[in-house]
């Protein structure tokens, strides 16, 4: 038989020893912390209900938990949607309508957490509009995204109207509000921190809002691969967000200041605007958000929003609600 030369034999033994060392070393799993992993890229926009995100960043809750998070902030939902679909974002804070709109292009996207229900901070401002029927023939500014279409549809239907009865001007929420304030449009679909202020500036009023409804839900979305590969990090992430939301729900002055600074308003203004959003913590996600037995469950909102997506021809066929979300992270918290 062939016998290895002494130097080569020692080389082979060294390689084998190295392989055994690597094989025996503890390997990271999706259920163990991954502090050495790349940062989670988390993005939100200028909706008041997303204030838990800047507070978690500003208070250092992610850092305290040993989680690296890159914080991105967008001035419009449309820009944020584009970035998420381009795989530039891991975790996105969106309306459920935005989420479903993206799922039509990427079915691997799933809703994994309920952030809030709009409770009056989304709405429509109008000038000389006394009833829904008065909207006929008017020029209305709204962004070409599903949740704003749903809000406008809910109002127009009360007057037996559709978008075919009005002129639509496609503008992001901030720009729509500015156009109304400048009296360039008759009505605008927008949200706080623009809704109330722009109504006054434009000589109008809030003629319709989401108060006492779950018409607009805000959620966190991620792709299947991230949910499976970084489950431990996602649990850490939402525990940090939970701490921030609890501060906001108790009107903590420092938290309100951090959130207000992000949106360009004072802490007192932030406190007032947050009255128009019902923020959910982990417990709320468990008992209401993903609880099919709750009358205010997110699942009811998804059913309505999925139907609207089909009606507006955003998706080619009706979507099954159970395919839109993954509640495994919430259940594990």
Please provide the spans of the model-predicted regions.
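Conserved C-terminal helix/tail region of periplasmic/extracytoplasmic solute-binding proteins
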Residues: 302-333
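Secondary-structure end/capping motifs
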Residues: 229-314
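Short, low-complexity disordered leader/linker segments with a strong preference
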Residues: 1-39, 333
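Pocket-lining segment of extracytoplasmic ligand-binding domains
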Residues: 90, 97-98, 168-169, 175-264
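Solvent-exposed, acidic/flexible segments
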Residues: 46, 73-77, 117, 145-149, ...
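Short linear loop/turn motifs
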Residues: 70, 78, 272-280, 320-332
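Solvent-exposed, polar/charged alpha-helical surfaces in well-ordered, non-transmembrane soluble domains
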Residues: 51-55, 59-60, 82-86, 100, ...
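Short, glycine-/small- and polar/acidic-enriched structural segments
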Residues: 31-163, 167-170, 186-192, 205-208
């Amino acid at each position: 038989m062939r016998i290895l030369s002494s130097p080569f034999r020692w080389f082979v033994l060294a390689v084998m020893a190295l392989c055994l060392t690597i094989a025996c070393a503890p390997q990271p799993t999706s259920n163990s912390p991954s502090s050495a992993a790349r940062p989670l890229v988390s993005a939100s926009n200028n909706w008041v209900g997303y204030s838990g995100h800047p507070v978690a960043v500003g208070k250092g809750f992610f850092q305290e938990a040993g989680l690296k998070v890159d914080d991105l902030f967008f001035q419009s939902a449309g820009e944020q949607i584009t970035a998420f679909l381009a795989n530039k974002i891991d975790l996105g804070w969106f309306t459920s309508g935005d989420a479903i709109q993206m799922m039509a292009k990427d079915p691997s996207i799933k809703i994994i957490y309920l952030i809030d229900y709009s409770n009056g901070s989304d709405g429509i401002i109008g000038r000389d509009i006394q009833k829904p029927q008065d909207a006929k023939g008017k020029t209305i500014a709204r962004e070409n995204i599903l949740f704003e279409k749903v809000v406008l549809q809910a109002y127009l239907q009360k007057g037996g109207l559709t978008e075919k009865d009005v002129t639509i001007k496609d503008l992001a929420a901030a720009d729509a509000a500015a156009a109304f304030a400048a009296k360039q449009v008759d009505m605008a679909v927008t949200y706080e921190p623009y809704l109330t202020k722009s109504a006054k500036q434009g000589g109008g009023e809030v003629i319709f809002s989401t108060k006492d409804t779950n018409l607009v839900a805000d959620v966190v979305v991620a792709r299947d691969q991230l949910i499976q590969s970084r489950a431990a990090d996602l649990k850490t992430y939402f525990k940090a967000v939970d701490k921030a939301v609890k501060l906001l729900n108790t009107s903590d002055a420092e938290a309100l200041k951090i959130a207000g600074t992000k949106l360009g308003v004072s802490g007192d203004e932030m406190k007032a605007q947050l009255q128009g959003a019902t923020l959910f913590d982990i417990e709320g996600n468990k008992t209401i958000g993903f609880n099919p037995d709750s009358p205010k469950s997110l699942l009811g909102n998804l059913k309505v929003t999925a139907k609207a997506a089909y009606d507006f021809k955003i998706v080619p066929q009706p979507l099954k609600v159970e395919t839109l979300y993954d509640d495994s992270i919430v259940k594990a918290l």
